[in-house]
């Protein structure tokens, strides 16, 4: 039961964090390109690499905390569904370059983010 509670609490925090961060990015950069979604997904990719690698290398992180952070917080913070919707809308609006850029940038930057998180955890 503590694992489910950890996932729920961390998930709620992740959702609010995504709302605030993405909203802030959109306020600065506008909505012509899905910068807010890209930002939260890249940050989330970095954090999953950091957390999972750190969890593999130490016994200091309990299973409840690891699952709360990864499934809960990062599950609420990152958003593949919004990425998909925003990319579809770009395609529907004839913004083929922006849609392609969003797909390529999301995949490439998220992979680099995950790698950077893993490398950072290995330095701890």
Curated annotation (Swiss-Prot):
GO process terms (BP): cellular detoxification of fluoride; fluoride transmembrane transport
Activity regulation, short description: Na(+) is not transported, but it plays an essential structural role and its presence is essential for fluoride channel function.
Example GO molecular function: metal ion binding
Signal peptide coordinates: none
Alphabetical keyword list: Cell inner membrane, Cell membrane, Ion channel, Ion transport, Membrane, Metal-binding, Sodium, Transmembrane, Transmembrane helix, Transport
Topology of this chain in the membrane: Multi-pass membrane protein
Cellular component GO terms, alphabetical: plasma membrane
Membrane-crossing segments per the record: 4-24, 32-52, 68-88, 101-121
UniProt catalytic activity: fluoride(in) = fluoride(out)
Source taxon at top rank: Bacteria
Major localization class: membrane
Keyword Cell inner membrane: yes
Compartment annotation: Cell inner membrane
Residues at which Na(+) binds: 75, 78
HAMAP family linked: FluC (MF_00454)
Family designation: Belongs to the fluoride channel Fluc/FEX (TC 1.A.43) family.
NCBIfam families, per database record: crcB
Primary role: Fluoride-specific ion channel. Important for reducing fluoride concentration in the cell, thus reducing its toxicity.
Protein name, as recorded: Fluoride-specific ion channel FluC
Gene from which the chain derives: fluC
């Amino acid at each position: 039961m503590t694992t489910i509670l950890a996932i729920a609490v961390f998930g709620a925090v992740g959702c609010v964090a995504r709302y605030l961060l993405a909203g802030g990015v959109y306020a600065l950069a506008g909505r012509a390109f899905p910068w807010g979604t890209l930002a939260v997904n890249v940050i989330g990719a970095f954090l999953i690499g950091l957390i999972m690698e750190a969890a593999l290398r130490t016994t200091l992180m309990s299973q409840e905390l690891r699952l709360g952070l990864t499934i809960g917080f990062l599950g609420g913070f990152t958003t593949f569904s919004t990425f998909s919707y925003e990319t579809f809308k770009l395609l529907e609006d004839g913004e083929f370059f922006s849609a392609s850029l969003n797909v390529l940038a999301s995949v490439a930057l998220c992979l680099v983010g995950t790698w950077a998180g893993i490398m950072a955890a290995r330095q701890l």
